[in-house]
Amino acid sequence: WLASDEDREGEAISWHLCEVLGLDEEKTNRIVFHEITKQAILDAIKNPRHLDMNLVNAQQARRVLDRLVGFKLSPILWRKVKPALSAGRVQSVAVRLIVEREREIQKFQSVPYYRVTAIFALISDSGNATEVKAELDQRFNTHEEVEAFLEKCKDAKFMVESVTKKPLKRSPAPPFTTSTLQQEAARKLGFTVVQTMMIAQKLYESGRITYMRTDSVNLSTLCSNASKDEIIREYGKEYSQTRAYHTSSKGAQEAHEAIRPTYMNEPTIEGTAQEKRLYELIWKRTIASQMADAQLEKTTININIGNTSEKFVATGEVVSFDGFLKVYLESTDDEEHAEDSSHILPALKEGDELQRREILATEKYSLAPARYTEASLVKKLEDLGIGRPSTYAPTISTIQQRQYVVKGDKTGEERTFTIDSLKGIKITQKLKKEMAGSEKGKLLPTDIGIVVNDFLMENFPNIMNYNFTADVEKKFDDIAEGKTEWTNWMKDFDKGFEPEVKEVLEARNQHKAGERNLGNDPKTGKPVFVKIGRFGPVGQIGSAEDKDKPQFAQLP
C-alpha cells in the first residue's frame, strides 16, 4: 500500500518507492486522502487505485526541465557574472518581477493634487446642529484652482440636491487555497510564507486540517453539511447559506479540496500559539464561506454649491444584517483607499439648506507602485499562472537565500504639504510635514539580483518571459492529463534552448555582466573596471589576459 500525498510530487514519491522496493505497479495499491482522520483513511483503504503515471510524468517533466534550465544557466552565471550563483525557471522570473517593480518606483514622478473636504451643519427648528462630512466630486491640480474655488465658496449657498439610498450586499471569500492562506496569514498574522507552510504542515500531520498544498476552493459535502450545522447552532438559521465554489486559477486541480478544518465543530484547538492562530484563521474563513451575505444600505447625498458646477458628496453605509461579517472579513493589500471611510449619515432630505462650517483643501501626492511583500508576490505569481501551490514558498525562500532579494524596510522622505482652510470668510494656510514612501517588510532587489536579472533578460529572454513560464505550467497540466508525451516535449524544448546557451558561452569578447570599464589608469595605462566580485563590489586595474595579475580593491 502506498499512501503519499495526493499531488504530482506525492505520486512521483510512490512511483520511486515502487522502483526502489521492486514492487509491481499493477499489483500495488495506491490510496489517497486529504485529511488524516480515521474515517478518511478507512474510506481510502476501501477505494484503492493504481499509480497514475500521467501524474508521475508531469512531475518528472517539471523536475527535469527545472534541472535542465538550472544546470545550464548557473555555470554561465559563474563565468559571466560571479561564482556560486544560480538561476531557475521560476525563481528568476520572481526576481524579475521585483527588479521591474523597483525600477518603476525609481522612475515614478509623484504629482501633487488637492483633495477638498467639508463639514456642514443642518440646523433643526429647535436649534440643534447635526454635522455632515462630505468630499468634493473632483480634485484640483494646482493651488490657483484651490484658491479660486474657496473664494467662490465664501458667498455660496449649500443645499441638498438629492438623497439616494441603495441596498448592497457583500459576499464571503471562498475557502483557502495555498496562495490565499499564505497571503491572509501574512496580512492578519504577520507570518512569512515559509512560516505559514511549516505551521500548516504540523496542523495537517496532527489531523487538524486538510492537505495544505492545493489550488482548489472546493469543499466536500460532508464539510458543507457540518458547517451548516455549526452555523445554525452558533448563530441561527438565517446566517446559513450553503455555497459551492469553483476554482478560477489556471491549471487548478478540482479533485482536491480547499484547506479547511477536519472537524467543523472545533473552532479552537490545543497547540502552540502560532498553531492556534493559524487554525482559527482557517476555521473562520471556512465557516464564513458557508454563511449568508451581509446586507447593507448605502446612502449618497449630493450637495449643490449655488455658484459653481462642482458638488460635494457625502456617503455612508449602514449594515442591516451582518451575515458572514459576524465571523470574518478578508484583508487587502490595497492602500489606495486607506483614507476612505463610510459612516452613518444624518437624516437629510432634498432641499435642506446646510451651513458651511469649514472647507479644507489638503495637498496630496500620487503614490508610486508599492513594493512586493511575500504575500503580494505570491498573488502576482498566481495571477500570471507561474508556479504551483507547492512552489510558492520554496521560490520566495530561494531568492532570499541566494541574496538576489532581501526583505527589509524603506525609510521615507520628509515632505511638506499645505492645508488651506475656509472658515467664515477667512482663508488660511498651514504647512505640515509628513514622512512619505515609508514601507516595512517589503522585498527589495540586491545589486547582484539586478545584475543577474539584467544578464538573463539580455541573453535568455525566452526563459525570462512571463508567458513562457505560464505556458510551461499549462504543458505540465497537459502531461498530467495524458495529452502530451513528456520526453518528446523535453527534447523539443532542449533543441531550442541549447543553441542559446552555446551562443552565450562562445561570446568571449563580452565583458562580464555587472562590469563597467571606467577608462585607463594614467600611471600604468591599464584598463580600470568596477564589477561585482565574490564578496561584493570591487575595483580592478588590469585584465586577466595581462602578464601581471590584476590589482583589486574592495569598494564600500
Question: Language-model features: where?
Answer:
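Phosphate-backbone binding and catalysis cores of DNA-processing enzymes
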Residues: W1-P167, E257-S320, F476, A480, ...
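A conserved hydrophobic secondary-structure block that centers on an alpha-helix together
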Residues: D5, E184, K188-T196
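Basic, low-complexity terminal or inter-domain segments flanking catalytic cores
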Residues: S74, K107, V193-V194, M212-P556
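Residues forming anionic-ligand binding surfaces in small-molecule and nucleic-acid pockets
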Residues: F158-Q183, A252-N265, Q355-I359
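Short acidic, hydrophobic short linear motifs in intrinsically disordered regions
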Residues: V160-T164, S171-A185, T210-T214, A368-K380, ...
